[in-house]
């Protein structure tokens, strides 16, 4: 793949043989952003798990302390009082049977979906539409619940879902290039802490193999996955 001149110039500033401390990595990622708009900052983790095995699938949610820089559009499958509560909490799309039919026909103008348990029998039929996109409500991630207001508020506040892909990678949006370094490091640390907490007991050998921070269209900066940074800037082993 041929890279642009600006990408190649940015990549020259990175030593790809070095593992950078998180604070240095976010500074370098912001410095080497190659787009003129407010780039998205992401982190990718390569895990030492076999995602083909159910007991090694790493899946969960994390509340980023500074959000992602984007307000998620939230759809809620609910009726009656729960629908009203979802709307009051800021849900963008709320409905029951008619909404389920719309989604079945391809409506996908949302970033997260929540459902009340009583509708999951019908929502479950949307698995082929929502599942591949990571949008299927799931009780393990708090998106199948009667407390729809809380779920909507958390998602709007920066709660994100994650799961390993078929190559054992995890991807997180941790903010925007306009965030300051401390905000990005704190979001990175929150994501890292949750990934470490969810290590499967059946995973053998090295669990966290690789971490990379990158911006939209920018080169990836390798991060030392054994370090995090506290607010004093001290390196702390994890």
Swiss-Prot record:
Pfam families: Ribosomal_L1. The gene is rplA. GO terms for biological process: regulation of translation; translation. GO terms for molecular function: rRNA binding; structural constituent of ribosome; tRNA binding. One of its GO terms (cellular component) is large ribosomal subunit. HAMAP family: Ribosomal_uL1_B. PANTHER family: 54S RIBOSOMAL PROTEIN L1, MITOCHONDRIAL (PTHR36427), LARGE RIBOSOMAL SUBUNIT PROTEIN UL1M (PTHR36427:SF3). It comes from Kineococcus radiotolerans (strain ATCC BAA-149 / DSM 14245 / SRS30216). This is Large ribosomal subunit protein uL1.
């Amino acid at each position: 793949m041929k890279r642009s001149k600006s990408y190649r110039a940015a990549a020259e500033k990175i030593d790809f043989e070095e593992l950078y401390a998180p604070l240095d990595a976010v500074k370098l990622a912001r410095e080497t952003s190659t787009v003129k708009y407010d780039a998205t900052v992401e982190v990718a983790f390569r895990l030492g798990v076999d995602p083909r095995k159910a007991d090694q699938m790493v899946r969960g949610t994390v509340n980023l302390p500074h959000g992602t820089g984007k307000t998620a559009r939230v759809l809620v499958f609910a009726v009656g009082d729960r629908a009203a509560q979802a709307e009051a909490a800021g849900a963008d799309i709320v409905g029951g049977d008619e909404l389920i039919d719309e989604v079945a026909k391809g409506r996908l103008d949302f970033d997260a979906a929540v459902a009340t348990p009583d509708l999951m029998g019908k929502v479950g039929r949307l698995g082929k539409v929502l599942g591949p996109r990571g949008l299927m409500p799931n009780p393990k991630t708090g998106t199948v619940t009667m407390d729809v207001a809380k779920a909507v508020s958390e998602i709007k506040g920066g709660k994100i879902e994650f799961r390993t892909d078929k190559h054992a990678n995890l991807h997180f949006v941790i903010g925007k290039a306009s965030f300051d370094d401390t905000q990005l490091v704190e979001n990175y640390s929150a994501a890292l802490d949750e990934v470490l907490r969810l290590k499967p007991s059946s995973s053998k050998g090295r669990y966290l193999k690789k971490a990379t921070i990158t911006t939209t269209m920018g080169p990836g900066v390798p991060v030392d996955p054994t370090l995090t940074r506290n607010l004093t800037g001290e390196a702390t082993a994890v």
